[in-house]
Every structure is written in C-alpha cells, then in structure tokens.
C-alpha cells in the first residue's frame, strides 16, 4: 500500500542534514520538511573539499530557493578547487596532479564513448598527466577566469573584446569551511516556509504495525510525526541502524587508517591560496591540506596500530616546522551499512557509510545518494513495504560504495615499504578480489567505463574512468607497451600526438591570461556575476 508523502523529517544537521534539506526543497514542491538538529551535538566535519556535483546545489535556481554563488563564497570563505595534488604516494619527494573533470577542450569519443585516448597517450609516452588546462592552472596557482582586453584569436572564438570570461563549465568544485557552510545552508533552508527547524535530540521512536516509523520522541518530550524519515545523524545512525536489523559491513581488512587529527593553520599576508587539495602521504597515513580564503583546514589521517596520537602530532609538527592545536580526536571505522534504505527511513552522509576522506567521497556521496533517490525513486506516493524497490536502491548504493572503497585502496598500490604501515597497506592481501581482477585486466588492455560497478545511469556517480586513470597514471600502474599497442590498433597514435602538441600550446596561452588565485579572491570575486560563462572547444 502506497504512503502519501506529506511530511519529511530529517534527523541531524551539519553538511549532510542541510544539503539533504536543500535538495528536497529544490526538487520537490509539496512535502513539508522538519529538520531536527541539536546545537549541543558537535559537527564532525573538519573542513571539506567537494566534487563538481556539489556545484549543482549552489548554482541551482528555482522558485523554492536560490543561493547566490558569490554571496556563498564571500560569506563562508570557500575557495575554488580544480583538483588534487598527491605527494609521496608512489615515491617520497614525487607528486602528481589529479584534475577534476575532462579537458576543457571537447573531443569526440572514438572508438567508443569513454575511450580516453588522450590519457592513454600519456601512458604510452611515460608522461605525467599535467597537460590538461586544469593541471597547469593547479601548477601555476591560477583560476579559469580571464579578461579579454585585446584580440586573442587562439582562444577567443567569439571575437569578444573587453569581456570577462568564466570557462569553469563543470570542471571545478569547492573547498569548504564545514562550520560556516553548514550555518550558511541552514539559514537559507529555514527561510523557506515549508521548513521547520527544531533544536532538540531524538531519544526514542514509535513504529507502526508494519515496522515503518510513526513518530520520533524528542528529549523535550515532543512527538514529531512523519511520512518519510532521513537519517543524517552521523556515526550515531539513530534511525537506520538502531531501529532496524541492519549490519555494518567493515572495510578494515582493506583500509588501515582509523583515526583523524584535524587542525587549522591561519593564513598570513603572504600565504598563497592554492586551487587544489593537497594530500601528502606520511609515515603512517596521510595529511590533507584544504585552502580557504582565511585559513587552511588540515588533518592527519593515520592508523593507530602503528602510531599514538601524541607521536602523530609530533610527526606533523616536525614536518611543518610549526606547533599545531588539534581540533579534536576522531576515531572511525571504515565501512558501510548493509541497507541504506529500510522501510520509510533513508540514510545519507556518515549515517550510511564512511571511508577515509581522500577524494571528497563523503560530501559527494551525501549529494549523490539523495539525488539518485530523488531522480529514480521518489514520488508523492511510495510503497515502503515493496521489498524489491528498496532492495534495488540498496544494491545500487552497495555497488557504488564498494567501488569507491576499491578506488581508495588503489592509492596504496605503492612501492613504498619505508614503514610497517606502508608494507601492510600496500600488500596484495589488502585488495579485494574485484580490484585484483581489474588490475589483471588492465595488464592486457586499458581501462574502460564498463569496468566500474558504480556506473549508474545518471549524472551523479562521478568516480569513473577519469579519476581512476589519474591515480593509475600517477601510481605508474599501467603499462606503456599496452597503451602504445592499443593506440596503434585504433590508428590513434599520430592523431593523439598532434592533439597533444596543440593542447600544450593552447593551454600555455590560456594559463597565461588567467588570474592568479590570490588576485582573483582579492579583486575579482566581488565581480563574479559580471563574468560570462563560456565553453571553449
């Protein structure tokens, strides 16, 4: 029997809770939304970077809710993210870029959709993947904005003069201050008349005879009824795990790190605001460095089987040559729930799964899971007892999360053996049977989109060929001779060489014109609405 969805109840605030509320406001028109989030419960977020999918939330426009991108950036101190710079992962002292998105120059898919002959060419020539415009912007501390003040036919296909151009398309993302972003989104969401915010804590629930949730009992004694509940309560998993027979599937046999030590570094007058997340492999894990307009959000993710929190702090302070003040000590378990949707309860964010924050997986999947649900499963009437419907969604999310877990494990496919942690993390036994199978396939042919489990038929998956290739290239896993043979078999070697030479020249011209990161934030961000968005071909 179908249930009409009139009231949606979201348990938990933070990035997960408020982005979920924002998604429902943007893409539904009828149901009322109640958000229950206690100010007494601290936000777990430690500074985040996003993928391009978060852009849709900030840039989405309709009559329900509007967010102005410039206003968001100015008030939260967020910055643009063009990619990730990996240091010390393959060899100590060596770095490689992992830019977001495809090249700004559009190419035809040949011999079939998803065949990335440009990246394959880099493998065939043993080249670092730094030819893309995004990579060069990263390495030169520039952003994809420029002014056309003179004739510039090499890039000015529209023959514009005295124009401000924004050629981001959807190839960049954001670096966020978790607390400021959560507060900003909260303010925007509760402005809407469909939303009711309750500062309280869930202590119990009441179920219907069919095991669906009927209402929540709050610490204050209030009873909050709902037709559909979304668990954004983080690692507590108040609804999705505690109210249903729902097992947690651990990834600890494949991913070793289990602790995080976040800290901040305030910007100085001469601090360069990078346009990339820097992830630096350390002795017993890795460190993130997320640049904001006012500070850096940093942290050491490590395995406490090999180092204590005190020694971890000493290692970071020695490497950075400064004293740090850890914001908190976060102990976590990598893994996912067996079921992401149970009856009339859906989970997202940390409530559903978590892996180490190496590729902006957490906030991406928060957005992706809700978007996929809204696109493929949501209606005003849902049968919460239709096991096949719910099972299909759960199978899809299981597939995606297991795919992401294998992608993270791939980062540890390293020749490093300098500590016990790296000897263990890089050992073959840490790879799933599926990842071993893929690596064997890629010894004989280059990767294809069909290789990834999470290839859902929508635009939100993201962790596909592009990202896998960049890690495979950076970690020097793919074979030069296989790449060369394949390009020759499709008669693409010479064609790609010409394209490679053209792109090098084109990229050099583009990067020369673009604003330096710091200059843009200081002088141009306030004029963001004056920039015309263009897609350069």
Language-model segment annotations:
Residues 281-333, 353-364, 379-382, 386:
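Conserved FAD/dinucleotide-binding core of flavoprotein oxidoreductases
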Residues 163-312, 370:
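Predominantly flavin-linked oxidoreductase catalytic cores and closely associated redox partners
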Residues 46-148:
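Dinucleotide-binding Rossmann-like beta1-alpha1 core, especially the glycine-rich loop
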Residues 25-46:
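Glycine-rich FAD pyrophosphate-binding loop
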Residues 340-358:
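Short FAD-binding loop at a beta-strand-to-alpha-helix junction that anchors the flavin cofactor
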Residues 6-31:
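N-terminal Rossmann-like FAD-binding beta1-loop-alpha1 element of flavoenzymes
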Residues 376-537:
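Long, low-complexity C-terminal extensions of enzymes
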């Amino acid at each position: 029997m179908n249930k009409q969805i009139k009231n949606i109840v979201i348990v938990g605030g933070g990035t997960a809770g408020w982005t979920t509320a924002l998604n429902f406001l943007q893409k539904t028109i009828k149901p009322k939304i109640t958000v229950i989030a206690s100010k007494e419960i601290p936000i777990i977020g430690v500074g985040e970077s996003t993928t391009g999918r978060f852009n849709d939330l900030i840039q989405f426009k309709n009559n329900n809710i509007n967010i102005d991108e410039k206003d968001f950036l100015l008030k939260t101190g967020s910055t643009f993210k063009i990619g990730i710079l990996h240091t010390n992962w393959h060899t100590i002292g060596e770095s490689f870029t992992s830019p977001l998105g495809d090249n700004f120059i559009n190419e035809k898919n040949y011999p079939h959709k998803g065949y990335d002959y440009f990246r394959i060419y880099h493998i065939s020539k043993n080249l670092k993947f730094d030819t893309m415009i995004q990579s060069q912007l990263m390495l030169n501390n520039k952003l994809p904005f420029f002014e056309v003040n003179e004739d510039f036919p090499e890039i000015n296909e529209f023959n514009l003069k005295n124009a401000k151009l924004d050629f981001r398309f959807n190839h960049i993302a954001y670096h966020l201050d978790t607390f400021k972003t959560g507060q900003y989104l909260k303010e925007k969401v509760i402005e809407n008349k469909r939303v009711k915010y309750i500062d309280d804590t869930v202590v119990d629930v009441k179920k219907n005879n069919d095991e669906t949730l009927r209402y929540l009992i709050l610490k204050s004694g209030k009873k909050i009824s709902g037709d559909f509940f979304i668990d954004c309560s983080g690692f507590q998993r108040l609804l999705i795990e505690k109210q249903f027979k729902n097992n947690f599937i651990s990834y600890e046999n494949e991913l070793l790190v289990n602790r995080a030590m976040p800290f901040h570094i305030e910007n100085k007058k001469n601090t360069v605001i990078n346009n990339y997340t820097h992830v630096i492999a350390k002795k017993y894990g890795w460190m993130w460095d997320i640049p904001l307009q006012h500070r850096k959000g940093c942290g050491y993710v490590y395995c406490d089987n090999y180092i204590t929190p005190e020694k971890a702090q000493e290692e970071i302070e020695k490497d950075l040559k400064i004293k740090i003040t850890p914001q908190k000590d976060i102990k976590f378990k990598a893994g996912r729930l067996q079921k992401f949707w149970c009856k009339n309860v859906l989970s997202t964010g940390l409530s559903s799964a978590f892996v180490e924050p190496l590729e902006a997986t957490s906030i991406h999947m928060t957005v992706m899971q809700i978007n996929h649900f809204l696109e493929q499963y949501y209606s005003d009437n849902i049968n919460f007892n239709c096991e096949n419907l719910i099972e299909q969604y759960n199978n899809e999310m299981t597939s995606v999360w297991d795919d992401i877990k294998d992608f993270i494990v791939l980062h540890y496919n390293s020749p490093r053996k300098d500590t016990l942690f790296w000897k263990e993390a890089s050992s073959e036994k840490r790879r799933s049977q599926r990842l071993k199978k893929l690596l064997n396939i890629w010894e004989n042919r280059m990767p294809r989109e069909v290789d990834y489990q999470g290839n859902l038929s929508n635009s939100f998956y993201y962790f596909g060929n592009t990202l896998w290739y960049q890690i495979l290239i950076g970690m020097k896993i793919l074979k030069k001779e296989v790449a060369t043979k394949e390009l020759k078999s499709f008669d693409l070697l010479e064609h790609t060489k010409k394209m490679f030479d053209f792109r090098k020249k084109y990229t050099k011209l583009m990067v020369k014109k673009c604003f330096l990161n710091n200059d843009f934030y200081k002088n141009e961000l306030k004029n963001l609405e004056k920039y015309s968005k263009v897609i350069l071909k």
